[in-house]
A protein has these predicted regions:
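Core segments of transmembrane alpha-helices
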Residues: 12-22, 86-101, 152-158
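Membrane-embedded alpha-helical segments that form the functional core of polytopic membrane enzymes
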Residues: 35-59
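Juxtamembrane boundary at the C-terminal end of a transmembrane helix
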Residues: 160-169
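Interfacial loop-to-transmembrane junctions
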Residues: 11, 126-155
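Intramembrane alpha-helical segments
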Residues: 2-33
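C-terminal ends of transmembrane helices
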Residues: 3-5, 57, 61, 65-66, ...
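Transmembrane helix-loop-helix
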Residues: 37-41, 91-138
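Solvent-exposed interhelical
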Residues: 50-94
Length: 169
């Protein structure tokens, strides 16, 4: 019933963002209080990394947009087309960094989490690849791996930033 409706990316963000982060926060909480799910904290902590995960799904469809459209899928790429999706990609990568920068600027995250900026060159490489070859399936078929590289570096550096913040207090 809900297949092929273009809900994969939003559901991916919700599942890997607020839901997964809220579950992790509940598990590490010193008290078991399931009545007070920390949705605000989960949203702040999980939004950027979840958007990076969603980016992998978004980029995995560039090479198969014609096949997706032929079977009636309404993925964001089918709806936007490859050119508009390629032009949207820099905004998506920028949003990831914004979602990871705002908690630092607001004093919620330690400054060491800015290590996530190390992933910027990988994000720029992904943007260049897709902008240059968005309509050439044979050249873009590995874009999901470039997106995965960005997501991995971004998440790893963010995690290291959180882990090392203790040493810089």
């Amino acid at each position: 019933m809900y297949k092929r409706q273009g809900l994969g990316e939003p559901l991916c963000w919700i599942a890997f963002g607020p839901l997964a982060t809220a579950a992790a926060l509940i598990v590490i909480s010193p008290k078991s209080n399931f009545d007070a799910i920390p949705w605000g904290t989960a949203l702040i902590v999980g939004a950027g990394p979840a958007m990076a995960t969603t980016l992998v799904l978004f980029c995995s469809h560039f090479h198969q947009i014609n096949q997706d459209a032929a079977v009636g899928k309404k993925s964001p790429l089918v709806v936007l087309g490859t050119n508009r999706a390629a032009n949207f990609l820099p905004w998506l990568v920028g949003l990831i960094f914004l979602l990871e920068l705002l908690p630092v600027l607001n004093g919620v995250w330690p400054i060491t989490t800015l290590m996530c900026l190390i992933s910027l060159p990988s994000g720029l490489d992904l943007i260049k690849l897709i902008k240059r070859h968005h309509n050439k399936p044979e050249l873009i078929k590995n874009s999901k791996f470039s997106a995965l590289r960005f997501q991995t570096i971004n998440g790893l550096c963010l995690s290291i930033g959180f882990a090392t913040s203790y040493f810089f207090l």
